[in-house]
Amino acid sequence: MIDFSLMIDYLRGRSSKGYELFGAHFVWENNQSQVCFAVYAPQAKVVSLIGDFNVWNPWPMQRLDCGVWVLTSPDPQPGDRYKYRITTAGGEIWDRADPFAFFTELRPNTASVIQRLDGYHWQDGAFLSTRQKNFNRPLNIYELHAGSWRMKDGDGSERFLQYDELADQLIPYIRQMGYTHIELLPLTEYPLDASWGYQVSGYFSATSRYGSPHQLMALIDRCHQAGIGVILDFVPTHFVPDYYALARFDGSCLYEPDNPNLRDSPWGTVLFDFTKPHVLSFLRSALDFWITVYHFDGIRYDAVSNLIYQGGSKDKGLNEPGLWFLRSTNFTLQQDHPEVMLIAEDSSDYLKVTAPVVYGGLGFDYKWNLGWMHDTLDYLATPFAERVGMKNRFLFSMSYFYQENYILPLSHDEVVHGKKTILDKLWGSYEQKFAQLRCLYCYMLFHPGKKLSFMGNELAEFMEWSEERQPGWNLLDYPVHRSFHTFLQRLNALYCTCPALWEQDFDSSYFQWLDMGSVFPEIFAIQRRDGSGQELVLLLNLSDRDCPNYPLSAHLPATPSAYRLLLDSQSKQEVDKEPLSSDSISLPGLSCLILQRENS
């Protein structure tokens, strides 16, 4: 039965539980199991249900006063395909997928599939009971595309690992590499593989490319049992223009703007209209759905700048409806799921993105620091002789860092579309690129902020990522790539075991530049501390010239003998961790050293 009070909340833009009202739900009526279908199509002239259970012959649905169409029948069964046949006010007939479908048949087919989500027995209670937003915990995220992380032999969809197969291989690898979380590129259903999931057709449907909803639940459950958090990439801004999905759903612009000048996105998709209350409820419900039903530990919102500014451009003015969506949705999610991370992929300089809504913020917990990423990679792509003039750009990120809670991303966006891979962006010879890659990750480790790196970065790829092939795992057969892979494991392990590198990320009193290139313009020193007094120091030489006598006594807070060497980026072996015995140290070109204060 339809709960009309919940329905009114949904239509007024106040609901985050629309998935409990709409779609196909099993109910017990007249002493038998039946399926209740409900769809919102207020401008439709007629809505009928078609599917396997009626040999695709239309069954007329009943229209309620609020514009919702309903039908209950004992005939539909789990696994049956179905659609809504909508006759518009103008007499056009369109067969539509269910906006609230929990599953969809494998592309290129587009029918919704009746799916029971109950019945999976979660075993992640211990993990959920200690789940936090990780402000004072290590947060080192491995971003991946589920369809291409590993691929099987074969053609088309046969190449994809199913969710359980992915779990078998991915979880041991993540534990081996020392990442704390994985972040999955969008898993909401989408028609085009080449969109990577960013052109969504089903906001409540886990893509059928990789298996069933219960298989996805099992992947997340197994990650949790292994101590690994799982973050979902989510697209709240736009959807596919295909007429089987949301576009002109009931013949009107139900989900998109009525004004055609405001309808199209830069990605060839259709923008949501956040002035329409039911759109707010639709997207808020989708976010709540993935957290509640699938136990995701964080949601990363894609393209937030387009919700802040019209067209994503500051020159076009604020997107007030988009801002209202962000504030109202994040406020609700923070209340309902206070331990789940809300992350903004935002390239704008809009302030208070990670401030609470009650203090005038947008209510996110973290924001990607794309400025740090661009400035750092641009510096390392600059010829050595020209880096002196780039010093201020390299240092710039710390001038604004404490305005937000930042994640430092080396994401999928930076290794596609001719941008080159992280390794290949770096200036210099083959050997110099690898030396700088080690320095980059050490610097990233020491820079305040949580960490994110895309799959393949750990292999030191030279080939850009493509969804059509897996990363170059065979690179690990080559000593230089295997050596970097091992180095990154050591670095990740160091990160997780040293609270100085994550405990006080967002408190400026626990970070200090010890050397901002004051004597040697391409040599820097950073100090990180934690609340117990542990102190780590990074010495970083980003020139191609050796510095045989770097003056430790001029830059370290204590005498050099109080420190021991923890890691050397040029050493393939564990370093001698005896206390330093000299007031100076050799710092080769394109290298870095990590020191630990003995009494810390």
Tell where the protein language model's regions lie, with residue ranges.
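Substrate-binding/active-site clefts of carbohydrate-active enzymes
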Residues: 105, 127-136, 145-296, 300-318
